């Protein structure tokens, strides 16, 4: 590799000696590759159009013969062939470079970025091409592209060198184009419904809005520990208190947690809050939002995912957590009187009981995660959660011990989370103080009491429905991607081992 780099570096020096800058400033393009392919799709073989076009892109393949060369040029839109003829270049570039064809053969490589001008022709073999009259090497690449990138078994190398992955894999570029369309469609749908997006702080004095371990940083001037936000919830609720009735924020969230095919410490979510609404309203919003985005981006409500077809046509299935656990395990949590009876029933069903399980609510959730979650392939709203695992949700209006909360599961993954939001400041204080006690007892995912948030609630927050959607997981679904790292352009990875460490 170092020899190849040295050879290419020498070519860059030769270009400078010839008076050509190998790292150009600009190039005027008249068309993209895709535009030319569409515009001249009906051009017959052997014909040429006497209209000058200009294009730029990366050389992806080159075949050089005696007095003729064929390059494949790739820009963001696609590829097109370059037809490079010695005599034609010698005549058209005589004033610029009398040895234009020789220098083209000797000083260009696959991976270089080239600008060309010429006319469009279709070869006798039927390949649409640009018959080049003038070219310029716009960027001399020093690193060769991998010959068999598709066959690499080291998947992490694709993530580490995403720029190369994007160059050689058009389907990867399409994933990120689709991601951009998804986020744009989400924003458009919410704005059409009267919501506005307001940005909230990334650096926060108190971590809150979720149970998660935060990243901690330090502000030198204020001499203050700060947290990277683990949710946008508490600040968006302050906006509801302040008089905004429909707000959302789509942005980055940071949680100091593990890495897996479903989790990245830095991820994207959207949180939506609507005054005078409840979790039933949020279910309807979630259905219509995701269905509309799928139709706009995928073109269908029947979405293929890893060999399965996911039907996103509303209405989606609704079931309580207790109903789903009963169906999967035979355990009727609604009839259990105390934790001791619950543990006995769970053990009798052959489900391992975690050591730290202080109440029936957490035991129910444990059974759900063990036996139900992975089976929820088609869109399912799991509703009515235990109060013990939902510190920010309003008590259920007719079911003691439960809260008005749902989570949306698709392909066995949580995709959205929603509450009828807790607006009682006294109840909220009790729950946050219980969470703070958990933190003091060693729970790294629990948080301290956010006194300013409680003060905001004491000024009066209207009935509110809240919703959070994991954007990365939604993009995974709508791009048929098995790993979250496939839909994050630059995912966090473990440091690469040095050559000495690898040998050891």
Swiss-Prot record:
The UniProt record lists the keyword Manganese: no
Major place of residence: cytoplasm
PROSITE patterns, sorted: AA_TRNA_LIGASE_II
GO MF term (any one): ATP binding
Subcellular location: Cytoplasm
GO terms, biological process: lysyl-tRNA aminoacylation
Pfam families, per the entry: tRNA-synt_2, tRNA_anti-codon
Catalytic activities: tRNA(Lys) + L-lysine + ATP = L-lysyl-tRNA(Lys) + AMP + diphosphate
Keywords tagged on the record: Aminoacyl-tRNA synthetase, ATP-binding, Cytoplasm, Ligase, Magnesium, Metal-binding, Nucleotide-binding, Protein biosynthesis
CC annotations in GO: cytosol
Cross-referenced CDD domains: LysRS_core (cd00775), LysRS_N (cd04322)
List of residues binding Mg(2+) 1: 407, 414
Domain of life: Bacteria
Residues the entry annotates as binding Mg(2+) 2: 414
Cofactor remark: Binds 3 Mg(2+) ions per subunit.
EC number: 6.1.1.6
Cofactors named for this entry: Mg(2+)
Subunit structure: Homodimer.
Family indicated by similarity: Belongs to the class-II aminoacyl-tRNA synthetase family.
HAMAP family: Lys_tRNA_synth_class2
NCBIfam families according to UniProt: lysS_bact, PRK00484.1
Protein name, per record: Lysine--tRNA ligase
Organism: Synechococcus elongatus (strain ATCC 33912 / PCC 7942 / FACHB-805) (Anacystis nidulans R2)
